[in-house]
Amino acid sequence: MKVTVFHANECDRKKCTSIKMEKLGKCKLVYNINKIPSGAVVLNPFAQKAVSYEDYRYVHRRGVVGLDCSWNEVSSSKKFFSLSKYHRSLPFLIATNPVNYGKPCILSTVEAVSATLYITRFKDEAKDILDGFKWGHTFLELNHDLLEAYSEADTSKDVVRVQNEFLESKE
């Protein structure tokens, strides 16, 4: 499974999950947006379409691309988001990384990539990419029911419906 991460050099390198992923041989870091593979699914928190099983073939053929930047600076990374026609956002999930533990939707790069792989039914790869992170298994355990429901949804609209039903049940 091809995983590429555009690294914006805005993070604390000691806590950076994409740098650790690269050291573990689980992704390729790029620092130039022109090095991002065309046709890959690009994770984009501003995308109108949620990742779903209908993205399976794009992830399988071209991979997934994460953006590693500060959540405080993500809106300034808009240039990154013009690179692919397969921009996808992630549905509601809860972070378990040490920096944002328990915060909804503020995922680390490795959590976002893992969630994308899980939702597109690359579940073994989703688990594997979290190996090497002490808290990695916690992400899948805490979000298990949602990830399963999202992975069973065939389309982006179905994923959004599952998300909305979950959020409404919590009100």
UniProtKB/Swiss-Prot annotation:
Keyword Cytoplasm among UniProt keywords: yes
EC number: 2.5.1.157
GO BP terms in the entry: enzyme-directed rRNA pseudouridine synthesis
Residues that bind S-adenosyl-L-methionine: T17, L67, L90, T109
Catalytic activity: an N(1)-methylpseudouridine in rRNA + S-adenosyl-L-methionine = N(1)-methyl-N(3)-[(3S)-3-amino-3-carboxypropyl]pseudouridine in rRNA + S-methyl-5'-thioadenosine + H(+)
GO cellular component: cytoplasm
UniProt key word Cytoplasm: yes
Main localization category: cytoplasm
First-level EC class: transferase
Localization terms from the record: Cytoplasm
UniProt keyword list: Cytoplasm, Ribosome biogenesis, rRNA processing, S-adenosyl-L-methionine, Transferase
Known role: Aminocarboxypropyltransferase that catalyzes the aminocarboxypropyl transfer on pseudouridine corresponding to position 914 in M.jannaschii 16S rRNA. It constitutes the last step in biosynthesis of the hypermodified N1-methyl-N3-(3-amino-3-carboxypropyl) pseudouridine (m1acp3-Psi).
Family statement drawn from the similarity comment of this UniProt entry: Belongs to the TDD superfamily. TSR3 family.
Protein name: 16S rRNA aminocarboxypropyltransferase
Organism: Methanobrevibacter smithii (strain ATCC 35061 / DSM 861 / OCM 144 / PS)
